Design a protein with these regions (language model features):
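Short secondary-structure boundary/capping segments within folded domains
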Residues: 10-14, 63-65
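Short, surface-exposed acidic-centric catalytic microdomains
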Residues: 29-90
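Structured helix-beta-strand junction loops
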Residues: 15-16, 69, 104-105
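Short loop/turn segments at strand-loop or loop-helix junctions that form parts
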Residues: 24, 76-78, 142
Length: 142
């Protein structure tokens, strides 16, 4: 059964963030743990670990890594109706306002983590379409 949810945690960024990576909406596991991409099947952290040759054992290490690399994380959606963690079930979507994070940082590129995030990004933030570096797919579950 789908339930209407509001995003449970804040965006992760600091004033030196240069890259913004946007997901669609947190998974059940991420909502439980209070941080982004915590579902064990999500490829987000393994991809970053491989790209940067690091091992990130916990949320504290993930956050330190993101700060060091000037990466900000947030989700396109502020609230939606969703069943479990299935992006295909999202309805009644309401977007996060990206202007606070964009005005407080040095964001130079915005990436999305999958098809749903990209679709909602384009729908809700059409004026940002020209921002370089929009990636359509990176972290879909098998």
């Amino acid at each position: 059964m789908s339930e209407f949810l509001t995003h449970p945690f804040e965006p992760f960024f600091d004033k030196d963030s240069k890259i913004l990576i946007l997901g669609s909406f947190p998974s059940v596991k991420s909502r439980q743990d209070g941080f982004y991409y915590q579902h064990p099947r999500n490829r987000f952290w393994p991809i970053l670990e491989t790209l940067f040759d690091v091992r990130l054992e916990n949320i504290t290490e993930q956050q330190a890594f993101l700060r060091k690399k000037h990466i900000a994380l947030w989700d396109v959606l502020q609230s939606c109706k969703i069943k479990n963690s299935d992006d295909k079930t999202i309805s009644y979507a309401k977007a996060n306002d990206l202007s606070p994070i964009l005005s407080q940082t040095k964001i130079q590129a915005i990436f999305t983590t999958g098809q749903s995030a990209y679709k909602f990004f384009i729908k809700f933030h059409p004026r940002l379409k020209a921002v370089r570096g929009i990636l359509k797919r990176t972290c879909n579950y098998p």
